[in-house]
Amino acid sequence: MNDYIRVNCTELRWPELVCAEPGSNSRGHSPPFHIANASITQLKAIDLLFLIDFSISKIMESLLQLETALRAVVEETKRPNAAAAFASLRRADPNNDPALTAVASRVVDLASEVTQLLEPAYLALADHLFGYQHTQCLAAVVELRIPDYLASGPQTFEQLSISSGTRRDRLRQVLRLLYNNGVFSYDAESDSVRNNEASEMLKQDHWTQWHRWASVCSKQFYQMAQGLPRAMSAGVTRSPAQVHYDTDESMFSYLERNGTMVQLRECMGAAAIAQTPGMITGYPWAELSNHTLFDLGGGDGSLIAGLLRAIPTLQGGIMDTPRVLPFLQEAFHHPSSKYADVALRIPPERVIAGDFLQEVIPSEAYVMRWCLHDWNDEQACQILRNIRRSIINSPVSRLIVLESVLADGRWGRMSRLGDINVMVTAEHGQERTETQWRQLAACTGWKVVSITQLPGAWPSAIDMRPVERPENV
């Protein structure tokens, strides 16, 4: 390496770093020096500059390799057979290969890490500051039924604006934001848009009924979240929603009294229906054949009904609050009930009112979906102790908790979004980490034997088995 070097460093008082031959005086700057005469400070600065230059070269090389690999993946998606596989991943089909889903989740998380390293900080802030636009634009296209107008196939903006009765310029602006973020697909050559796996689920007749979330998130949840700053202040016990509405009532009671609970109940019911298939296929419920499974806090009954349909020899029961009981009786035990086909295996005497903070109906097996995240640790422990006291010991005895497990990374973002959602709406609302779930189990007479992420669903199946009952349980 040429040992005549000119250094661009304010402390060293040389204007630039260049390789220079002995005796040269490039650009009229100070003469080159011989490295043998450099001070320790000068040598460290020279070394640092070469390291920076070397690091930039390595980063550039790595990024170019990554770019090549990503382009290859994008090209792969265009092959007919591969396109179907990628579409299945996008739909979160419960029958997808778990190994493929696991690899996809790792790639998504890594891609997100790389994005955070490369993306300018102001763009990261912009996503948060202007995030309301995504919600409101999505709500607008749902209200205008744009996904339904595209049900028969792609349309140009001119065609779509005519069929939907919208302004073409503003329709283009809104859809541009959405299709660049994975909702709808755009073809530049024909200047047309079509439904993709995400926008397809927003159609009014789609079985998941995801469209119901658009209105609730853009209005009710958006309003409730405005109470966050005050609710985060030290000493405040109200939830953000209670702060915003200035009430001590629970959100369910408040919305019921104000006539807006129906919309929220429909929204929650849609979420349950959309995720039930993954909850059924993702855990070995068949191990409970010929036994009775009680759904504690069974809500709309969709989970136990789905399990009874999937396992013909399973018996079922539901315990929920007196307020919910009329809805459950209508769902199972009226001539036109939507779950009438399984009513004989969940008779009226096993659809009961109760309070699991007080006591629980005896059974060999229990399932709880989206219940414990509404309670603080003390209350959750009380519920788990009550179930432990009531469980009938047998080879199949267990409690399956269907709740989110907090996780970092892009793939795990639903657990964090859910964490904020229950915190906003419930006074003690919180999701928990795997460590927290294991601690709750250990101090209430349970052992977590497995935690399984369910396909196409937000929660995991946390399998708890009764252990030797400690004195304090």
Curated annotation (Swiss-Prot):
Alphabetically ordered keywords of this record: Methyltransferase, S-adenosyl-L-methionine, Transferase
Keyword S-adenosyl-L-methionine attached: yes
Catalytic residues in the record: 373
Chain positions recorded as S-adenosyl-L-methionine binding sites: 320, 354-356
Enzyme Commission numbers on file: 2.1.1.-
Gene3D superfamilies: Vaccinia Virus protein VP39, Winged helix-like DNA-binding domain superfamily/Winged helix DNA-binding domain
Pathway in which the depicted protein is active: Mycotoxin biosynthesis
GO molecular function: O-methyltransferase activity; protein dimerization activity
Keyword S-adenosyl-L-methionine attributed: yes
UniProt cross-references to InterPro entries, sorted A to Z: COMT-like (IPR016461), O_MeTrfase_dom (IPR001077), Plant_O-MeTrfase_dimerisation (IPR012967), SAM-dependent_MTases_sf (IPR029063), WH-like_DNA-bd_sf (IPR036388), WH_DNA-bd_sf (IPR036390)
Any one Gene Ontology BP term: secondary metabolite biosynthetic process
Family of this protein: Belongs to the class I-like SAM-binding methyltransferase superfamily. Cation-independent O-methyltransferase family. COMT subfamily.
Function according to Swiss-Prot or TrEMBL: O-methyltransferase; part of the gene cluster that mediates the biosynthesis of aspirochlorine (or antibiotic A30641), an unusual halogenated spiro compound with distinctive antifungal properties due to selective inhibition of protein biosynthesis, and which is also active against bacteria, viruses, and murine tumor cells. The non-ribosomal peptide synthetase (NRPS) aclP is responsible the formation of the diketopiperazine (DKP) core from the condensation of 2 phenylalanine residues.
PANTHER family in UniProt: O-METHYLTRANSFERASE CICE, PUTATIVE (AFU_ORTHOLOGUE AFUA_4G14580)-RELATED
Protein name: O-methyltransferase aclU
